[in-house]
Curated annotation (Swiss-Prot):
PANTHER family: IG-LIKE DOMAIN-CONTAINING PROTEIN, T-CELL RECEPTOR ALPHA CHAIN V REGION. Pfam families: V-set. Glycans are attached at residue 78. The gene is TRAV38-2DV8. It comes from Homo sapiens. This is T cell receptor alpha variable 38-2/delta variable 8. The keyword Disulfide bond applies. The keyword Iron does not apply.
């Protein structure tokens, strides 16, 4: 049972990739934050490709997967979508999602994905 005022975000290590020999890893199995806090979810990946896309999806209790944000590897500017932003570090192969001013509706499982 969740406590009022707390958001539960499950982060499942997953590999939602569309090409072979690529790996995507998420390190946090579960997080909880209070409403209005900022939370950062981390993702690393391994690829030898130079042109690719990275995505963050969320799956709320309704079980419908929703695209939160995407980043093209050739763009140097980090993607931003309302309260969601990424910290994309191509050289370090790191792709973190930052959720600012978290809300109860943000409670979900979050998935990092790669596509070449």
């Amino acid at each position: 049972m969740a406590c009022p005022g707390f958001l539960w975000a499950l982060v499942i290590s997953t590999c939602l990739e569309f090409s072979m020999a690529q790996t995507v890893t998420q390190s946090q199995p579960e997080m909880s934050v209070q409403e209005a806090e900022t939370v950062t979810l981390s993702c690393t990946y391994d690829t030898s490709e130079s042109d690719y896309y990275l995505f963050w999806y969320k799956q709320p209790p309704s079980r419908q997967m929703i695209l939160v944000i995407r980043q093209e590897a050739y763009k140097q500017q980090n993607a931003t979508e309302n309260r969601f932003s990424v910290n994309f570090q191509k050289a370090a192969k790191s792709f973190s999602l930052k959720i600012s001013d978290s809300q109860l509706g943000d409670a979900a499982m979050y998935f990092c994905a790669y596509r070449s």
